[in-house]
Amino acid sequence: MLDFSGREVVVTGGTGALGSAVVGRLITAGAIVHVPVYIAEELQRFPYRGHEAVRVHEGLDLGKEGDVARLYGATSALYASVHVAGGFSMGPIADTSLESWEHLMRMNATTCFLCCREAVRTLNGGEGRIVNVAARPALVPTAQMSAYAASKAAVSALTLSLAEETAESGVWVNAIVPSIIDTEVNRAAMPDADHAAWPSPEQIAETIAFLASPQNAVTRGALVPVYGRS
């Protein structure tokens, strides 16, 4: 049984489909969860707004060092940091602009780097957990996803390197590797697909919560597939 009692967890991207599931699982396990929000409208769909165990931090851009520092500075007993925030786009490389490339790198790789760095600084040599979100195209060659795959490959490499760097201090760093998640957006985009093969956000949240928990006593430096049958 997972137990986060007395522990604080940062969850970026916490208002999205997967992020909300992670927040819900963590508060069920007793965590105080800090959720940064950049676009205020995102809170309208966030089911845990106003929950006594959730701290919402509005107006924070995770691509800016100062905003990330303010987020982690608001914690007092940080134990884990879960980085779900990111973005997706695809298309032939010939049609991919430099702006699109840099946008995806910032959304996926830069935000992950800044949050990992600030989490390590905040933990300050103490025990903790970091969980990143990579993606299957970063590991399995996939056409028309050059920019997206590269940005998530950066997340994967960051995870593996940081896991070695922080091992002695007891900070376990891992990443989950999803393929297609069963969300309303994905169902609408792929109406003829086998939706039953896709893992739900709640199922993936279970894996994330374990990796972020004190009960994860040995797993570090892992890129954990959460594909389901997809």
Would you name each region that the model predicts?
Residues 116, 151:
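Active-site helix of classical SDR
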Residues 15:
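Conserved glycine-rich cofactor-binding loop
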Residues 135:
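Residue(s) in the substrate-gating loop at a strand-loop-helix junction
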Residues 168, 175, 183, 193-230:
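C-terminal helical subdomain
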Residues 121, 164-168:
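Alpha-helical segment proximal to the catalytic Tyr-Lys
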Residues 96, 141-149, 161:
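Active-site loop-to-helix junction immediately N-terminal to the catalytic Tyr of the SDR YXXXK motif
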Residues 92-93, 100-102:
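Substrate-binding pocket helix/loop in short-chain dehydrogenase/reductase
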